[in-house]
């Protein structure tokens, strides 16, 4: 399996740690960076390349939807797989995220299997994983 790189964006450190542990267990050798909000993620995405972004919706400074919208406006990030990992699972929020160009949606709380399935699907679709 080729090495993949993921940016995990969430203001809750325990969620970032949970996501990173889950991904490291399933994808040995994965490169993971993290950010505490959309603004920090924006700075990281401006200087580094990733295969996938996993992002919370509700965060201080810049929310996940704002980060997603910004990514879709950048030529080099327009097709970057972007999965929302959020407690905002109601229909209006899901539709809003889809309209903004989200690649996938994982509702909190989630199981490791749910997260890994969404990540694998997004990476396969983008041609970043060997099937």
Model-assigned labels for residue ranges:
Residues 59:
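Receiver (REC) domain active-site loop signature in two-component systems and cognate sites
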Residues 48-54:
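Active-site beta3 strand of CheY-like receiver
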Residues 34-43, 64:
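Helix N-cap/capping motif at the beta->alpha junctions
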Residues 110-119:
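C-terminal output helix
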Residues 13-33:
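Two-component/phosphorelay signaling modules centered on CheY-like receiver
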């Amino acid at each position: 399996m080729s090495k993949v790189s993921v940016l995990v964006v969430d203001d809750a450190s325990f969620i970032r740690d949970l996501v990173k542990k889950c991904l490291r267990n399933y994808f040995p050798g994965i490169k993971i960076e993290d950010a505490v909000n959309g603004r920090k993620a924006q700075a990281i995405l401006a200087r580094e390349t990733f295969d996938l972004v996993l992002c919370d919706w509700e965060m201080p400074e810049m929310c996940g939807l704002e980060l997603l919208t910004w990514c879709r406006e950048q030529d080099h990030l327009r097709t970057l797989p972007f999965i929302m990992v959020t407690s905002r699972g109601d229909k209006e929020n899901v539709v809003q995220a889809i309209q903004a160009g989200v690649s996938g949606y994982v509702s909190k709380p989630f199981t490791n299997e749910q997260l890994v399935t969404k990540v694998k699907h997004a990476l396969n679709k983008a041609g970043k994983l060997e099937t």
